[in-house]
Amino acid sequence: MLGLKGLVGTLCWLAIPTLALAGSTSDNQGVAGLCLLIGIVVSVPVFALLPFVQSHFATDGKLKRFFQPLQVMRLFSRAPMAHLFSLFLILVLALPLFLLKVEQVPREFLWTLSLLFIAFAWPSRMLAGWASGRGARKEKPVRWWLRYPIQFFAAPISFLFAVIFYLTRYISWNGTLSLLENHVFLLPAPFWLGG
């Protein structure tokens, strides 16, 4: 039941940016451009917060934790460097895994790729928990003159990842459908929709 709650909460966060990015394949250039703009703009805060929202949910398994982003932002303000460091590593560790989606792998070899996906995803989850734990142990936020510049850098990191995430549909054998196989936030598996 915990996994189902996590999936539902994560899908709520990813629905708008993912569907908007998928909508950017429209034949109408105006609609496609608008969808791309909406998808990228909405993806930036989603990608910056979602790993920590998932970590917040994992503390007690209550679905309502997915809808408390202010709690996560408070934790971020108490340990901004830990959150920025872990966000960077979470998104960087996800990048090489996109290359494994270039060509469809025979079904009998999928388990080997799944092990690789889990090996990259597990440290990411641990980093998110570590950063959230550091924020939870501190009483007060870091001084604003230090906190705001650090928090500012989360946006370009997430923006760059959102652009790369969007472009991966051009190298994935699954095309636009690969946007729904977001191994960073959903199942750490290579081809769970079309495999």
Predicted regions and their residues:
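Alpha-helical transmembrane segments and their membrane-interface junctions
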Residues: 11-25, 86-108, 161-179
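Long, highly hydrophobic alpha-helical transmembrane signal-anchor segments
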Residues: 1-37
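Interfacial aromatic "cap" segments that immediately flank transmembrane helices
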Residues: 1-13, 51-99, 139-157
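Cytosolic/matrix-facing juxtamembrane and C-terminal tails of multi-pass cellular membrane proteins
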Residues: 133-194
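Selective recognition of hydrophobic, aromatic-rich stretches within alpha-helical transmembrane segments
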Residues: 26-66, 99-146
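Enriched - but not universal
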Residues: 16, 114, 125, 147-148, ...
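Membrane-embedded alpha-helical bundles that form the substrate/pore pathway
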Residues: 6-10, 40-43, 159-162
